[in-house]
Amino acid sequence: MAERLTLAFMGSPDFSVPALHALHQAGHHIAAVYTQPPRPAGRGHRLTPCPVHRAAEALGLEVRHPALLKNAADEHEAFRALNLDAAVVAAYGLILPRVMLDTPQRGCLNIHASLLPRWRGASPIQNAILAGDTESGVTIMRMEEGLDTGPMLLKRAVPITETTTTPELHDALATAGAEAILHVLETQPDGENQDDALACYAPKLSRADGLLDWSQPAALLARRVRALNPWPGTFSGSLKILAAHAVTEASGIPGTVIGIGDDTLLIACGDGALCLDKVQKPGRPALDAAAFLRGHKLPAGTRLDEHGFS
């Protein structure tokens, strides 16, 4: 390593953990790790620390989890007292006020899970798959007050295939982000301004996004299944659809069963059909199509409605 830097790390979910480990293993001095506060989780609603919090404690690092940063003078002063060369931010979850953005000597550097300016916002991984993009990637940018608008220091592309799922792309981008931030800290590249005319946005997802509309093309629905599992999940009525693929040479009334085999369950769409590979009923284990069909007799014409199959 050319230079040992004093850093703050700011992140919360699994996506951020590889970058924290990479910075620590590279020998940088991580003065403090900022995460979201512990949240109630599980049946007992016990306060549970986030993945970055747990990883930081395992490394023996100081963990801070302020509930807010805006208008929090004590937090701003504590951040300033770290005497940072840079802060590395990866899916932290809180907006950094300008006073904090301006504190580190080299600024606050964000690991964003898209090739900016495409897919600014909260759900870039899912939206890249939903849109049918053939590649995604990570961008290291110097943060400004705008939403993912700062100068870009480095981009690393990652391919998206016709079978790529959100968990697979998430893990590939997390690894790419860890490698990219090490390179940026070592080489200190000049920033390139983003072209706002090319920007598009990835809004926060909700459960409603997972409802499948069978009047849509099968290719689009297959992308929804790949993009929106495990959360918010994809479903039709009470039936969760965990894995599926599109079949183009098929037609029928949208939302009805048009093909059944030993391990094949085809649902007609607005264009083509969706072959359900793995499904789950409420309170039941997930089943592949063959296991599901052994327990459910579904003649052709059976319709998926708000209760599942009818």
Curated annotation (Swiss-Prot):
Enzyme Commission code: 2.1.2.9
PROSITE patterns per the UniProt record, alphabetical: GART
GO cellular component: cytosol
InterPro entries the record matches: Fmt, Formyl_trans_C, Formyl_trans_C_sf, Formyl_transf_N, Formyl_transf_N_sf, Formyl_transferase-like_C_sf, GART_AS, Met-tRNA-FMT_C
Regions annotated as coiled coil: none
Catalytic activity: L-methionyl-tRNA(fMet) + (6R)-10-formyltetrahydrofolate = N-formyl-L-methionyl-tRNA(fMet) + (6S)-5,6,7,8-tetrahydrofolate + H(+)
Transmembrane segments: none
Key words of the record: Protein biosynthesis, Transferase
Annotated Gene3D superfamilies: Formyl transferase, C-terminal domain (3.10.25.10), Formyl transferase, N-terminal domain (3.40.50.170)
Entry keyword annotation includes Protein biosynthesis: yes
CDD domains (alphabetical): FMT_core_Met-tRNA-FMT_N, Met_tRNA_FMT_C
Pfam families: Formyl_trans_C (PF02911), Formyl_trans_N (PF00551)
Function: Attaches a formyl group to the free amino group of methionyl-tRNA(fMet). The formyl group appears to play a dual role in the initiator identity of N-formylmethionyl-tRNA by promoting its recognition by IF2 and preventing the misappropriation of this tRNA by the elongation apparatus.
Xref: NCBIfam families: fmt
Alphabetical list of PANTHER family matching this protein: METHIONYL-TRNA FORMYLTRANSFERASE, METHIONYL-TRNA FORMYLTRANSFERASE, MITOCHONDRIAL
Name of this protein: Methionyl-tRNA formyltransferase
